[in-house]
């Protein structure tokens, strides 16, 4: 069992026992690029932490060049926004590959593709993805000539899902990523998303059939969650939890890493039952106000949504088609439910949400 952790600015940063997923991704990286990979899972299940661990600690820095484009927290509404996220402008009179070689000596990944100022101005002026993709491909080919394997990782890709530049930008990106992987075998591509509705749309997209694959980063199963509690209790509280205490924590928050961390941290100043009841009460209030807003606008919709949620009183996970498509898509979009398109199942985003549903309805 591997335990990997660090302290940054006094905060405990989670990373724990994702060896199965790490092994799968490292195996992909060792082969030739041939598919686009979508890394998905419930909210706060540890997707970004997993990728960060691989970038920072698991790959050979002399062999790979990683471009990690994080769209989280960035407002993208127009072409210029997209370009500014994708590229890093520089003014030196050097080739992009030379800039890249100098930068990767000090950092594990680059947050944008280095681009000379005059080139970036031309790209912005023409407003066409053709020039963008051509430039990126040339940079990636230069990296390959240097004996290194490029990797592109885009976090929260769904943020550009509705953006149009001569058609939907997302489809142009998909086509380009397929070209980089399945056609040219030039660059590994990973797309991260916690938006399971977006993943379902990708999964159903005919143009991507046999060109993409999926890696699920789910909340911990019970066995791993209990071991994670042992690990955190030793590190944060300098003591062990009893089996009953761990079972109680799991019954409230399940295997959601961030919620387990929150519980253990609060135990420094509060009792366990008080902490768990407080967290559940907070989740119930959020759900109550969410349903109240719906009821005020449309009582018929409220009744349908309440009926759908009541199905979870007996089961944590159900077949997706048990809930009408428009209702399930609404609940997934609002992050009440998580959809797994590969299994065709729905479940609450966390045990905490599940407990709130059971007690409120």
Curated annotation (Swiss-Prot):
Highest taxon listed in the record's lineage: Archaea
Residues that, per the record, bind ATP: 41-48
UniProt xrefs under SMART domains: AAA (SM00382)
Molecular function via GO: ATP binding; ATP hydrolysis activity
Species: Methanocaldococcus jannaschii (strain ATCC 43067 / DSM 2661 / JAL-1 / JCM 10045 / NBRC 100440)
Pfam families on file: ATPase_2 (PF01637), MJ1010-like_2nd (PF21690)
Keywords of the record: ATP-binding, Nucleotide-binding
InterPro entries assigned: AAA+_ATPase (IPR003593), Archaeal_ATPase_domain (IPR051667), ATPase_dom (IPR011579), MJ1010-like_2nd (IPR049081), P-loop_NTPase (IPR027417), WH-like_DNA-bd_sf (IPR036388)
Family from the record: Belongs to the archaeal ATPase family.
Name of the molecule in the record: Uncharacterized ATP-binding protein MJ0439
Coiled-coil intervals: none
């Amino acid at each position: 069992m591997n335990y990997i952790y660090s302290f940054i600015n006094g905060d405990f940063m989670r990373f724990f026992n994702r060896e199965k997923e790490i092994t799968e991704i490292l195996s992909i990286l060792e082969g030739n690029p041939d598919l686009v990979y979508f890394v998905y899972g419930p909210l706060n299940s540890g997707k970004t932490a997993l990728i960060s661990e691989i970038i920072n600690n698991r790959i050979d820095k002399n062999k790979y060049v990683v471009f990690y484009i994080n769209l989280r927290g960035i407002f993208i509404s127009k072409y210029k926004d997209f370009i500014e996220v994708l590229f890093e402008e520089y003014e030196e009179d050097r080739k992009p590959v030379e800039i890249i070689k100098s930068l990767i000596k000090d950092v594990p990944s680059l947050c944008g593709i280095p681009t000379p100022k005059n080139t970036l101005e031309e790209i912005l002026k023409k407003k066409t993805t053709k020039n963008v993709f051509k430039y990126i491909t040339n940079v990636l080919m230069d990296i390959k000539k240097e004996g290194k394997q490029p990797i592109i990782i885009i976090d929260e890709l769904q943020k550009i899902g509705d953006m149009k530049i001569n058609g939907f930008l997302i489809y142009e990106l998909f086509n380009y990523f397929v070209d980089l992987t399945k056609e040219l075998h030039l660059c590994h591509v990973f797309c991260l998303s916690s938006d399971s509705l977006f993943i379902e749309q990708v999964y159903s997209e005919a143009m991507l059939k046999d060109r993409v694959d999926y890696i699920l980063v789910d909340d911990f199963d019970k066995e791993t969650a209990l071991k994670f509690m042992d690990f955190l209790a030793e590190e944060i509280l300098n003591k062990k939890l009893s089996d009953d205490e761990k079972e109680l924590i799991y019954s409230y928050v399940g295997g959601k890493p961030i919620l387990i961390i929150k519980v253990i941290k609060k135990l420094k100043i509060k009792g366990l039952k008080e902490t768990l009841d407080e967290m559940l009460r907070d989740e119930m209030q959020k759900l109550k106000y969410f349903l109240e807003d719906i009821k005020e606008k449309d009582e018929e919709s409220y009744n349908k949504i309440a009926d759908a949620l009541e199905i979870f009183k007996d089961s944590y996970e159900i077949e997706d088609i048990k809930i009408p498509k428009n209702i399930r898509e609404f609940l997934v979009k609002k992050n009440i439910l998580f959809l797994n398109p590969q299994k065709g199942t729905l479940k609450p985003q966390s045990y905490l949400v599940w407990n709130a549903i059971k007690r409120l309805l």
